[in-house]
């Protein structure tokens, strides 16, 4: 720790009324920062007012800075009073006074411009941010056939604007703070004031304020610092890149955490069923959506249990199979030198390797690697009598079922649970299969997220089952979805009024 910084990495000292002291301090603190731009000049009729301007090259809008700040100050008719800066600059720039060097340097490193005046024990902060960023693009990770196509970017302000564009309500609040003692990353909590539960909001704010770490660079990191129960493989927060999903979640009383430099937004609290919901579920008719959701729940059971079920049947209980199926199983396994458990684990781990390789390879090559690699490896393993054709089918169906679930974080938990069930079934057969599923369900029922049961609406404490299940496995018609979820503020759960024609 140097003599400029505190133990929490904040800068010491206040702004000096002597401009040379401020120049010396800034030059020392920002030593070897070649992207720092420093300009010293004098203004006024007789050039009697000394100014010192500081900003970071590449982080500011230099054209705006020149037109709105520097050019008005350099006018020959500029009066002698320092307070005249207000009249010349305030009208054309967003600004405020700051008193400490910590505020000044943080502002500069955040893309703002700081102006020091000789004789003033404070400085002027001008908002001049212009970060290099990509534009709004299609949501490539959460593809929807119908509905909006835009997605979040790495810009905090652009992301909040995408949400604000969809909710034009004065009660939509944006609380902006910083996190990370060194990175000082901006983040914003967004919620609707009359829908959010205040105790949940306060808990989240307290947790965010308690985080003391060098830097937070993505919401995936922030999620791990916020979670209270790190012993569960199931995600306790939802990440999304779709503004429409965030907007609809906020209008259900949930809270969005928008982090600068992250193209994903964090939503909380969450329940088990939200991970089975896709954005276009609400843009299609309820019959289609209900059918697809039932398929997703079936796919979840298949992705967790099918390999383990095969191990249990083939290794312990072949007698439960009808004779034609049993003969087919014996014929398929003829010549395979490995026991069933080794056979299944070999193919499952091979598929996981192919999946990881496909993710890491660039562009279209990754998808090609997954398809072609799977075909080649599977066929070669069957031809070499290392695995049976039935195992290849089981692994392929499991993979397809996993990809049918619309949330990547959630499917990662299912992939781990799959191996958990395979091991149990290898030791205890069908008893291990049912015991494993029972353990998973008990675990889900005991989880909670900021006081909200994770298994909601299957765990319903207040007896409102008719309203709790309106957006579960069966998605009601939009006209009948009259109530918001249980984690909405008490007294604000009516989403739409009764239709007089329906009475």
What is each of the regions a protein language model found here?
Residues 309-312, 322-503:
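Generic detector of multi-pass transmembrane helix bundles and their immediately adjacent loops
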Residues 1-305, 323, 444-503:
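Membrane-embedded alpha-helical signal segments
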Residues 300-320:
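Hydrophobic alpha-helical segments embedded in or immediately adjacent to the lipid bilayer
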